[in-house]
Every structure is written in structure tokens, then in C-alpha cells.
Swiss-Prot record:
It is found in: Cell inner membrane. It comes from Rickettsia africae (strain ESF-5). Keywords: ATP synthesis, Cell inner membrane, Cell membrane, CF(1), Hydrogen ion transport, Ion transport, Membrane, Transport. The keyword Cell membrane applies. Belongs to the ATPase gamma chain family. This is ATP synthase gamma chain. InterPro entries: ATP_synth_F1_ATPase_gsu, ATP_synth_F1_gsu, RPE2. One of its GO terms (biological process) is proton motive force-driven plasma membrane ATP synthesis. GO terms for cellular component: plasma membrane; proton-transporting ATP synthase complex. It is a peripheral membrane protein. GO terms for molecular function: ATP binding; proton-transporting ATP synthase activity, rotational mechanism. Produces ATP from ADP in the presence of a proton gradient across the membrane. The gamma chain is believed to be important in regulating ATPase activity and the flow of protons through the CF(0) complex. F-type ATPases have 2 components, CF(1) - the catalytic core - and CF(0) - the membrane proton channel. CF(1) has five subunits: alpha(3), beta(3), gamma(1), delta(1), epsilon(1). CF(0) has three main subunits: a, b and c. It comes from the Bacteria.
Amino acid sequence: MSNLKQLRTRIKSVKSTQKITKAMQLVSASKMAKIKSQIANSNFYIEAVSKMMSAILSIDMYELSIEEQKFFNTVPNKANLLIVMTSQRGLCGTFNYSIIKQVKNDIKELENKGEQIKLIIIGKKGYEALKRQYVNYIDSYFELPKIHDENLMLQVKQKIMSAVENLEISNCVIYFNKFKNAMTQIMTRQQILPVAKYQDDSMIDNPIVNLVGFGYKERGVKPINNRRATSDIVGESKSIDYNYEYEGASLISNLINLYVNSQINYALLQSRASEEGARMTAMENATNNANDLISKLVLKLNRSRQAIITTELIEIIAGSEAV
């Protein structure tokens, strides 16, 4: 009888856990749908800013102010700034593992080359995984708020802008999971600075981009005699001529601010959508596993009950025959 009681208690416990995992699955699905909507709404803006920044690469760097040039050129013998985006909470499968593994591999490669490293970590899980081994490299750590927060973007942007303006870094790379669907998140390492030629989503087939600190060559600059640049119009095949000369002295500086902010925002949204997708899938698997376990436990319970009943019947029959 004690065995039956233990089985009933365990079935009750698994059913309780199943309710929790099912609820978490539904919550993550709702959050993921909301973030996907935010990504869709921001894609056009992010693409437009990225293409305008890419167009500036055709401008003679001498036409830019010294402060502006810092965002387009590599400063030798300075630190590689790595921004690592992970989750604040667990229960999301291998979401954090792929990011942390890639960051560790890249840090090892940079160390072998004798290069300096700075880390900005967003999310508790990434911080916990990296602090023991790389505490001396960690420049800043930010907790990931429960909802999308512009405050976080501004703080990270300020860290990047300050590091560039003070000539503390040679390049800036951001690590995040790019959302494809609920079951697939693609680990992406994307260069923010120095500003590189714009690439559309086709880069997703090979998301790990070669960078200066990882062996890429400093880009060449095509000189021209004024602050004009040509780029493709977003969503169209023809080109547009951007004239920055007559738009105010601070236009490019403002555009740089928008660009850095949009890149951080893009990575945060992609990371959040990927996290919720990974958590939804993990909780769905947990719910299904709980259901399978309940079926096995119920079968075991029924067999145990049948065995007890059979034993009791045999005892009754044996007793009646003895009489």
C-alpha cells in the first residue's frame, strides 16, 4: 500500500509541474509574438540608418571631423570591445550556451594574439558564466529588465560612444542570438564599429563576420571631394544620392548616435525574441515529457493495484479451500 501511495504522490507532483511548464510555454509564446511585432516595426528604420551609414564610407575621411572619423577607422593597439547578450533567467535550453562558447573561443584567439579585451555583458547568465575566468576583462555588467527598456540601450550606447571618443577601443563587436523561428536561433557575431559596408539578411547564412581583431584587413576609403555619398534606396533597386554637406555640421554625428542606438536595439529585440522562442520550445518539451512520465506512472500504479488485488484474491481462495 505504501508503494501505491508513493506512486499517487509522484503522479500528483508531476501533474503540478506539467501545469507550470504549460503556463510558462503560453507566456513565452505571447511574449515572443509581441517582440516579433516590434522587430517587424523597427526593421525598416534600422535598415535605413544602416544603409545611410554605409553610404558615408564613400566619403573622403578628411571631409569628416576628427570626432566623426573615430567611428569609421580602426585605432591600432587598443582593446577589442565585446558586447555579450544573454538571458537574465534560465529554462531556455541551449540559448546561452552557444553565445558563451563563441565568446570564449574568440577571447582565447585574441589572447593568443596578445590583444587587449573589454567585455560588456548584458544578462545574468552570461555574467555568471564569464566572471570567474574573465573578471579582469569585464568593463560593465547590465541586468536585463523584464520588458524592453530604452534606458538599457542608452547606457550601453553611452559606454560605446565614450570608449570610441576616448580612443580606448579598436573595434566593437556584439554577440546575440538572431531569431529565425521558435525552434531555431542563430548565434550571430556582428560588427558595430568601425562602421562596415551594409549587409542585408543574406548574411544570416554565414553570421560570424570576420573582423579586425579576428584577422580582417582595415577597409580602404574611396576619396571624393565633398560630403556626398551614394547608396541603394531601402527596398528599391535604384540608388539615392545623400548630400551631407548642406544638412548641418552635426548631421553625421547625430546619424552615428542613431546608428549605434539602432544596432543595440536590433540585437536586444532579436535576443529577446530568441530567448522567448527557446524557452517556449523548452517548456513544450518539458510538458510533453511530463505527460509521457504521467502515462508511465499511471500504468505502473494500475499494475501495482492489480497485483495487490490478485494477491488478495489468491489469499481468500486459499483460505476458503483450507476451511
